[in-house]
Structure formats: structure tokens, C-alpha cells
From Swiss-Prot:
Chief place where the protein resides: membrane
Gene of this entry: Arl4a
Pfam families, A to Z: Arf
CDD domains in the record: Arl4_Arl7
Protein name: ADP-ribosylation factor-like protein 4A
Gene Ontology terms: biological process: brown fat cell differentiation; intracellular protein transport; vesicle-mediated transport
Origin superkingdom: Eukaryota
Length: 200
């Protein structure tokens, strides 16, 4: 699921085998942001407590094409009082990972509001967004099409590339696939920005 980014290109093959990307992990409190971060770092479940400020980790990931990239993740607390700080972390970011709890139907409207708010900030125009639909292993989780509708993904700016990825952060299902999609979107954006600079 996404807006026109499903085509497979050979962009990755022309890149150096080592790259670093600044990624911000956002989402409501209790969505599973920190669980996502430490599952990626340690490849195991780490019991976490609510994030009061932020966690930051540099994590090397080998993508499907055997290229190793470093993601510098900033996992920012999702409590309401911390959300005004989100824009400070997204300044100059390469990509945003927005984690939603696939079971928490009652807070999906709140998640939608925050997602649209952060993507509409001028500095974030065009920044790729990976929406992580977490807790997909639970029986009462919403389907991807339901989440896409509730988050009003079709109403995001046409300049904002996005991908909705089903995951289970506790066991790691879907996380690497999501990162590969995010990486693809970032590379496409960088290439587009370079082409725009050449035309000036």
C-alpha cells in the first residue's frame, strides 16, 4: 500500500554500499515505538517503559540487496505534552516512522490528527513516511485497509510519499520490509532533489 511507490527500480544498485539516514520514530504513547527501536537494534523483544524524552540509536541494517545502511533513529515520547517537541526532531530528517496501535480503534482519530499535523509542517513537506501498523498479530487488530481509511492516508499531501506496513514489533515481523520501503522512498526523494538542483 502506498502512493505510486510500488515500482521496483534499480536506484539502489547505483549507490555506495554504505549510507547513513536520520529517521524519527513518532506515534501516540503505547503504540510500540520503543519496542520497534529495540527489536531492530537487538533482534529480540525488550520490555520497555513509556519514553519521557527520547531514545536514540544507530543501527546497521542489511537490506535485501545486501547493502548495509545505518539508520540513526530518534524515538520520541508520544505523550500529549511531548508532541509539540516532535517538530524539533523532524527538522532535516530523512524519513519519519509513524507507529500506530492496530488494536486501539478509539485512538485512531487522535493518531490521524498527529500524523497529518507533523507531515504538514513546511520542513516536512516531501519527507517519506513509513506508517507501521503494529500489533497485527492480535486477533482484534484492524486490517490495513481499515487503518488506511481511519488515518485518511489519501488526504496526505501528494508530495508526501508513504507506505503502510503491517508489523508485529514483539517478534519483528514486517519491520525489515518496512525499512526497505522507507529506504527506497528516501533514495527516490534524494535523487529528485538532486535533479531539481541541477535545473536551477
Amino acid at each position: 500500500m502506498g502512493n505510486g511507490l510500488s515500482d521496483q527500480t534499480s536506484i539502489l544498485s547505483s549507490l555506495p554500499s554504505f549510507q547513513s539516514f536520520h529517521i524519527v520514530i513518532l506515534g501516540l504513547d503505547c503504540a510500540g515505538k520503543t519496542t520497534v527501536l529495540y527489536r531492530l537494534q537487538f533482534n529480540e523483544f525488550v520490555n520497555t517503559v513509556p519514553t519521557k524524552g527520547f531514545n536514540t540509536e544507530k543501527i546497521k541494517v542489511t537490506l535485501g540487496n545486501s547493502k548495509t545502511v545505518t539508520f540513526h533513529f530518534w524515538d520520541v515520547g508520544g505523550q500529549e505534552k511531548l508532541r509539540p517537541l516532535w517538530k524539533s526532531y523532524t527538522r532535516c530528517t530523512d524519513g519519519i516512522v509513524f507507529v500506530v496501535d492496530s488494536v486501539d480503534v478509539e485512538r485512531m482519530e487522535e493518531a490521524k490528527t498527529e500524523l497529518h499535523k507533523i507531515t504538514r509542517i513546511s520542513e516536512n513537506q516531501g519527507v517519506p513516511v513509513l506508517i507501521v501498523a503494529n500489533k497485527q498479530d492480535l486477533r482484534n487488530s484492524l486490517s490495513l485497509s481499515e487503518i488506511e481509511k481511519l488515518l485518511a492516508m489519501g488526504e496526505l499531501s501528494s508530495s508526501t510519499p508513504w507506505h503502510l506496513q503491517p508489523t508485529c514489533a514483539i517478534i519483528g515481523d514486517g519491520l525489515k520490509e518496512g525499512l526497505e520501503k522507507l529506504h527506497d522512498m528516501i533514495i527516490k526523494r534524494r535523487k529528485m532533489l538532486r535533479q531539481q538542483k541541477k535545473k536551477r
